[in-house]
């Protein structure tokens, strides 16, 4: 999918609005662009006040107008955020866990 920066940034805005968060790695795959290009796009969009960046991605800016937006992020949202890296961590960790060992974290829970 070949796009100019204007088209790509508009599509990124659309994805952020639909999904709430996006990851650099995922966007690079979607747009067949380098991660450096996507990071530059996210920096540009953050400077314009459209998104807020976090390590590895960007999120929709909450208006603070609704009660749900001002609440702390819940388990479901944390679970979905950066799920691919969490799955890779869990797959590595599961090799170190033996019968009878337990760990209450949600990273390990993904392997259940």
From Swiss-Prot:
GO molecular function: DNA binding; DNA-binding transcription factor activity
PROSITE patterns noted in UniProt: HTH_DEOR_1, HTH_DEOR_2
Keywords (A to Z) from UniProt: DNA-binding, Repressor, Transcription, Transcription regulation
SMART domains (UniProt xref): HTH_DEOR
Residue ranges: DNA binding: 22-41
Domain spans labelled HTH deoR-type: 5-60
InterPro entries: Carb_Metab_HTH_regulators, DeoR_HTH, Tscrpt_reg_HTH_DeoR_CS, WH-like_DNA-bd_sf, WH_DNA-bd_sf
Pfam families: HTH_DeoR
Biological role stated in the UniProt entry: Repressor of the gat operon for galacticol transport and metabolism. In K12 strains the operon is constitutively expressed because this gene is inactive.
Protein name stated in the entry: Putative galactitol utilization operon repressor
The species this protein was found in: Escherichia coli (strain K12)
């Amino acid at each position: 999918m070949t796009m100019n920066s204007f088209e790509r940034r508009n599509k990124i805005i659309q994805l952020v609005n639909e999904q709430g968060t996006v990851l650099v790695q995922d966007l690079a795959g979607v747009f067949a662009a380098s991660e450096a290009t996507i990071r530059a796009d996210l920096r540009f969009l953050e400077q314009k006040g459209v998104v807020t960046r976090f390590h590895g991605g960007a999120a929709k800016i909450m208006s603070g107008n609704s009660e749900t937006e001002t609440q702390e992020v819940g388990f479901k949202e944390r679970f979905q955020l950066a799920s691919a890296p969490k799955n890779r961590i869990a797959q590595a960790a599961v090799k170190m866990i033996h019968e009878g060992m337990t760990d209450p974290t949600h990273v390990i829970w993904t392997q259940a």
